[in-house]
């Protein structure tokens, strides 16, 4: 702005006052421009203009399609119906576990059976039904069938047990629960605490003695249900589709609301931004209860007619064999998955596949080039975006290490920003005018996205819990009176506008591809340790993605039955949430508001040369906590100890 005003001033002064010829005026302006650092702008412009134009066109295309869907009140089931009409007999889903193949027509008929059956059982538009099962074709057919009826699906994380699992079912107010037979034991554990009015249905192998007494076998009931489309509910593009549970920033899992427009937007931005094709075949081994697997992956099938291969769980040893068997051209990943593949011994299969794109997030810069070159993958399509966020990013031109970009030239087109935060408290830093201070290139800051509720691409749908929404929204961020979504993630932007993931703030960290809520883990550990003070945080471990969980426990005597503690943890917490490291110390220091001071604990980490308190780590082979001495620390640092 200042540079522009200066140029105009020089132009007027040179021409009107000095009466110089236009050639001299031009040289004067060029001299001033370059002298004021304008050459940086020219450099950025030349290097990024093609990228920015392409990104802008993608944004405009998706925005136009979203507006059309809004006008015509289209929903995901309506959009899927048009996909079925285009190619009814094309393969839609393949389940690797049984080689079960569903065409688009079969998926359509199965989902309609689900809708008609639930309608016959009294469920109606606006009701909620929960799904608790491992990956398979039926998972997609179930929530899609619910959507056809206007019933909102609550997609429960299959790793959750007991309190967390019960919390998800209770807060969703589900009237029905469909669970896979493989999850029967987990349902039996909480059956006594479930609402007696909750209808229970089991899909898969049927053993009456292995499920709660009130459970019905769903599969034969669906075979008898009508396969025609039920009467369409009065739903619009901004109405609720389903709920995905996320740890958010604190506490037990929260239900993030996914509306039809959000589902479309997330899938479409990936499709157009990374130049996908309708004849691509996607290999999806990510959990379908998360947005990466169910929206970014399955969304390409439902909305764009791709074939998606579903795997129950990721297998490093079978990964490339599967890709060859099913002729996959796109694979989905999380950063940890890529490291597992690189740790596998070389094999012929990794050179015989047809994969042209790896799509996902969390791939570290240190292994990025090695991953793409060893496995001969031309395009790494890295993106950033939580289920509930309004500031998704895409690395459309495969810049190594970047999770996306924002134009330095036309930054106002996509209103996101990195803002300064206090390193210790993670509070937003504001200027004298009360507005958040934007970061300069190279300066880490929290990513925020401006909220515009009337714009489907900028709206924040939030969580079912209003209190959780309040914690994710800040005011006066871009300008006075506005609102912005707080991602809780620290990124850094380079001079060209590429964004790189740095850290996860708030009270979560990421481990084994899952967000771990420190508050939830702290509560569980404290309860198991007779309400001792416990601080949980993530620590970096060389050669691994994310942060490993570490728990600092206030234990004045230093005594703890760690063997029994490890056994109980197996029943109370999913594997990814169990602390890898333990630190026993006399007391935990707190802030004036009784929050644990974790900054120093994080900095000290688990190095026995720095930490003088007793340290322990979870030995994966022994299944218990053992002392962490200098020798064990060296093995962990060298990657010789499995965590």
UniProtKB/Swiss-Prot annotation:
Gene designation: SLC27A4
Species this chain originates from: Pongo abelii (Sumatran orangutan)
Protein name stated in the entry: Long-chain fatty acid transport protein 4
Function text: Mediates the import of long-chain fatty acids (LCFA) into the cell by facilitating their transport across cell membranes. Appears to be the principal fatty acid transporter in small intestinal enterocytes. Also functions as an acyl-CoA ligase catalyzing the ATP-dependent formation of fatty acyl-CoA using LCFA and very-long-chain fatty acids (VLCFA) as substrates, which prevents fatty acid efflux from cells and might drive more fatty acid uptake. Plays a role in the formation of the epidermal barrier. Required for fat absorption in early embryogenesis.
Location, primary (coarse class): endoplasmic reticulum
Transmembrane segments: 20-42, 139-156
Family: Belongs to the ATP-dependent AMP-binding enzyme family.
Keywords: Endoplasmic reticulum, Fatty acid metabolism, Ligase, Lipid metabolism, Lipid transport, Membrane, Nucleotide-binding, Transmembrane, Transmembrane helix, Transport
Catalytic activity as recorded in UniProt: a fatty acid(in) = a fatty acid(out); (9Z,12Z)-octadecadienoate(out) = (9Z,12Z)-octadecadienoate(in); (9Z)-octadecenoate(out) = (9Z)-octadecenoate(in); hexadecanoate(out) = hexadecanoate(in)
